[in-house]
Amino acid sequence: MSQLPSLSQLRDPHAFLRRHLGPDAAEQQAMLDSLGLGSRVELIEQTVPPGIRLNRELDLPPALDEQAALARLRGYAEQNQVWTSLIGMGYHGTLTPTVILRNVLENPGWYTAYTPYQPEIAQGRLEALLNFQQLTIDLTGLELANASLLDEATAAAEAMALAKRVAKSKSNLFFVDENCHPQTISVVQTRAEGFGFELIVDAVDNLKQHQVFGALLQYPDTHGEIRDLRPLIDHLHAQQALACVAADLLSLLLLTPPGELGADVVFGSSQRFGVPMGYGGPHAAVFASREEYKRAIPGRIIGVSKDARGNVALRMALQTREQHIRREKANSNICTAQVLLANIASFYAVYHGPEGLKRIAQRVHRLTCILAAGLERHGIQRLNQHFFDTLTLDVGGAQTAIIESAQAAQINLRILGRGQLGLSLDEACDENTVARLFDVLLGADHGLSIDDLDAETLASGIPEMLQRSTSYLRHPVFNAHHSETEMLRYLKQLENKDLALNQSMIPLGSCTMKLNATSEMIPITWPQFANLHPFVPREQAVGYTLMIEELERWLCAITGFDAICMQPNSGAQGEYAGLLAIRKYHESRQQGGRDICLIPSSAHGTNPASAQMAGMRVVIVECDDAGNVDLEDLKAKASEAGAKLSCLMATYPSTHGVYEEGISEICEVIHKHGGQVYMDGANLNAQVGLARPADIGADVSHMNLHKTFCIPHGGGGPGMGPIGVRAHLAPFVANHPVVPIDGPQPQNGAVSAAPWGSASILPISWMYIAMMGPQLADASEVAILAANYLAQHLSGAFPVLYTGRNERVAHECILDLRPLKAATGISEEDVAKRLMDYGFHAPTMSFPVPGTLMVEPTESESKAELDRFIGAMLSIRAEITEVQNGNWPAEDNPLKRAPHTMADITGVWERPYSIEQGITPDAHTKAHKYWPAVNRVDNVYGDRNLFCACVPVDDYR
């Protein structure tokens, strides 16, 4: 009788690893065989320079299986205490409609998509973002809006920068209302320091004492007061300065829009439009301006254009403003945004419609009026005369007793100095909330009845002169999907227009579109993580603290750094935060004159944009013919900079997709001249477990948790870009004015609105590392294997532009299409669009080298999917040969006409190739056809005829 396997033999500690990796062991071996290799070890020996290799297992706890990891994280979550938080300050309770929760936030068709650079396969989320822009335009009363920024505080900093760019005033002074949210003031102070702006934080009544280029005003202000801003705005305009207004989006349903008051820029958070507080984020900021500032506005703008058949099509407009084009001359270093959260907010508006939204706002205001009336009758002094949802109270010596009573009732109030308290009501509040507040503030024997107060004619807290009279959201999209059936189908219709990871590989170079495992995603909607206000007392967030501290320890083990700053909520913000730490470090050593930042010519566009934001001068270091940093040019420029050298920004592996042999020497050159090394973490997926940035010589590096550590891209955000630093830089990273962080110097300003950035998505990365453990190195190795497998099989058709040692690439490779374009006129864009007909998202176009495609397959794609991509690319190469041989006209062939749509086959087909060749060019497309929603979009038309609001329905006819 055969012996049954024992429990120890049946234990499967690497079950998740096998789920995460695309190719199984046999497929990996087949791929290695095709490369002439016997093992992954041999591949790594041939690829990664021996001098930087880790050569030991990562110091991480053993991998947990999915259920064990979820159980452990649940244990952390249960240590968070979810109280009724009425702290306000830009964060409010909200109710996410379940149809949106299930079909958007929990749907990989929405959260695994990439930024819509390829509009033909992104029309669904482009429409959702256009709705978001329309929502912003209507509520703010301005003409132009972008498709979201990272948070309200960074939006304020962007508003200040825009004001300086466009204001005719010659002043270098920017005014900030002292009654803005404190986190906003801190982020603006941080940004002003980098730009060299003078900043005045004062009462708005003193604005007229100053000559400024702009001012930041809050409406309603942080204490709830609603002020008529017209006199202040008129004064600013008289001195050719800009008025930038931070507004509460829900209040604008009842308040006169700031644009009607004369504001030039309006921004705020869309968080209370259905996005949980999440201990600080992620949330989509709204940002609107006058149309005349369209070339200066930061972030993505979704515009209306036409496709090749003349039909309405959407696209990202005016991209020449952005960092990937303009580099150090860009308006901003903004790279990602908060698309997934902007979509949720826009769908919240679509689902509720104008009347539903108004009802929510009116209900919040009515509850606040009832509360205010009851308190007033009991002699509680209210410090803000007018209000929407926020009351600031002077309770004098009763403050301590009231705080204790609130704690007993599990209610968080805003605790202010001088015997004052603040409270903000929200959508999640009801009559019971107000009754509990009466008990807390007045004692149980107050004798007030909510019903009796509600039956009275209570005065509005909004002054009559500031009550909204203009209509909003009249477009049909906001008035047609109010039943759940209609909303469900609308969401599905939009989703079907887009291509995401749930349909096929997205081989975008430098983007790391790997698996976002379901087990990693589940915890983000747990109430214990989703419903915490970022400014609750730390004892209510013990679970978050334990999870974040453990994640920081793991990231230190992975990177070799001594400390982690979790605050940056994007990779570009991480760059900025790291460079600020370097700047403060030099200043602490009386070397504040070090302001030259060396950047290789191949760098991401965010690098020079971030450097100029941190107050540095950018000097470009050339690359040699092999794509590596020119060491002699680096030495010469470092020597020339001398005592002015601040740092080098370098990406590793390089943006050219190779492990540079001289990286350690490059770091030594910088250190020899007194500089610091900033390592861009965009390509960390090729380092984890194989090498560590700090060991290589980096002093600081950001980690894209939305690339390497599995936070999904969300169609263009959210992201997280925490930085790792060596010990000497640790005191100089960001702190926070509301929730001080242990470690950094107390005087350090914030770079994001919340202390730990977008904290509610950190469980995703925690889960990934917990389930992979030391075997994270396997992911890096398989990613490198997949890239070399593609390079090997495609190099005969499309030359691989750069290779490293032994002709190997790192985790991505650049295919050079320039010779083919010169010979045939077929461009990299034509190939990108043709790939859509094969059911693929294109690789990264023309970065870092124009006329090329950069391909990154990641470790998560199966051999079958890699082979399908290879087959598609080789088939496209054969199509190019047909053009080259004259069998198809140069301008009328499947590549120039790509992508093909349903409209093409329902119309008259008069083309030199068959419908089958155009529509279903391979076996996969015959069985699993993905239809692009529109034909090729006309980029030039869209920029020349900028239109960034919802399209009239008749335009689709």
From Swiss-Prot:
GO terms for cellular component: cytosol; glycine cleavage complex. It comes from Pseudomonas fluorescens (strain Pf0-1). InterPro entries: GcvP (IPR003437), GDC-P_C (IPR049316), GDC-P_N (IPR049315), GDC_P (IPR020581), PyrdxlP-dep_Trfase (IPR015424), PyrdxlP-dep_Trfase_major (IPR015421), PyrdxlP-dep_Trfase_small (IPR015422). The glycine cleavage system catalyzes the degradation of glycine. The P protein binds the alpha-amino group of glycine through its pyridoxal phosphate cofactor; CO(2) is released and the remaining methylamine moiety is then transferred to the lipoamide cofactor of the H protein. The keyword Oxidoreductase applies. The glycine cleavage system is composed of four proteins: P, T, L and H. Keywords: Oxidoreductase, Pyridoxal phosphate. The modification N6-(pyridoxal phosphate)lysine is found at residue 707. This is Glycine dehydrogenase (decarboxylating) 2. Its EC number is 1.4.4.2. GO terms for biological process: glycine decarboxylation via glycine cleavage system. Belongs to the GcvP family. It catalyses: N(6)-[(R)-lipoyl]-L-lysyl-[glycine-cleavage complex H protein] + glycine + H(+) = N(6)-[(R)-S(8)-aminomethyldihydrolipoyl]-L-lysyl-[glycine-cleavage complex H protein] + CO2. One of its GO terms (molecular function) is pyridoxal phosphate binding. Its cofactor is pyridoxal 5'-phosphate. It is an enzyme of class 1 (oxidoreductase). It holds the Pfam family GDC-P. PANTHER family: GLYCINE DEHYDROGENASE (DECARBOXYLATING), GLYCINE DEHYDROGENASE, DECARBOXYLATING.
